[in-house]
């Protein structure tokens, strides 16, 4: 059982996925900071000093922190847009690289193609010898 787990855990796809999750979490923190520390204050200046995180409805001792919810939605939209742009650029670069590799690769002829070429050459030789006779 341990060997099966090691084989699974250290497969290339699992390790790639783990790295992707860690990098994604770090990227999410960067974008959240961008939203919280840069974009929201700028938006607050444009809208007259509004800070979404402090918006709330109070009912006695309880509060509904709808401003924090709005901020979380805003974070999500910016993170989604940033990831979309990253994936779009990545896919464009990857497709260009694949196209270049396809252009550079000249496939070797298959056995059938080699055999057909030899048959063609033999037929040419036979036809040229018949024409001389």
From Swiss-Prot:
InterPro entries tied to this protein: Mechanosensitive_channel_CS, MS_channel, MSC/AndL, MscL_channel
Naturally occurring in which organism (per UniProt): Bacillus cereus (strain AH187)
Complex and partners: Homopentamer.
Biological function: Channel that opens in response to stretch forces in the membrane lipid bilayer. May participate in the regulation of osmotic pressure changes within the cell.
Protein name, entry field: Large-conductance mechanosensitive channel
Family that this chain belongs to: Belongs to the MscL family.
Gene3D superfamilies: Large-conductance mechanosensitive channel, MscL, domain 1 (1.10.1200.120)
Transmembrane segments: 14-34, 67-87
Keyword annotations: Cell membrane, Ion channel, Ion transport, Membrane, Transmembrane, Transmembrane helix, Transport
PANTHER family linked to this entry: LARGE-CONDUCTANCE MECHANOSENSITIVE CHANNEL, MECHANOSENSITIVE CHANNEL MSCL
NCBIfam families: mscL (TIGR00220), PRK00567.1-4 (NF001843), PRK13955.1 (NF010560)
Gene that encodes the chain: mscL
Keyword Transferase: no
UniProt GO MF annotations: mechanosensitive monoatomic ion channel activity
PROSITE patterns xrefs: MSCL
Cellular component terms (Gene Ontology): plasma membrane
Membrane topology, record value: Multi-pass membrane protein
Compartments (UniProt record): Cell membrane
């Amino acid at each position: 059982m341990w060997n099966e787990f090691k084989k699974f855990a250290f497969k290339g796809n699992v390790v790639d996925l783990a790295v992707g999750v860690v990098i994604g979490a770090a990227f999410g923190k960067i974008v959240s900071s961008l939203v919280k520390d840069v974009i929201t204050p700028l938006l607050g200046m444009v809208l007259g000093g509004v800070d979404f995180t402090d918006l709330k409805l109070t009912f006695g001792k309880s509060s509904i922190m709808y401003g924090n919810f709005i901020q979380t939605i805003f974070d999500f939209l910016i993170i989604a847009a940033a990831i979309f742009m990253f994936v779009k650029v990545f896919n464009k670069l990857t497709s260009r690289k694949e196209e270049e590799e396809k252009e550079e690769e000249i496939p070797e002829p298959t056995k059938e193609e080699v055999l057909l070429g030899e048959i063609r050459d033999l037929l040419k030789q036979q036809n040229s010898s018949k024409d001389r006779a």
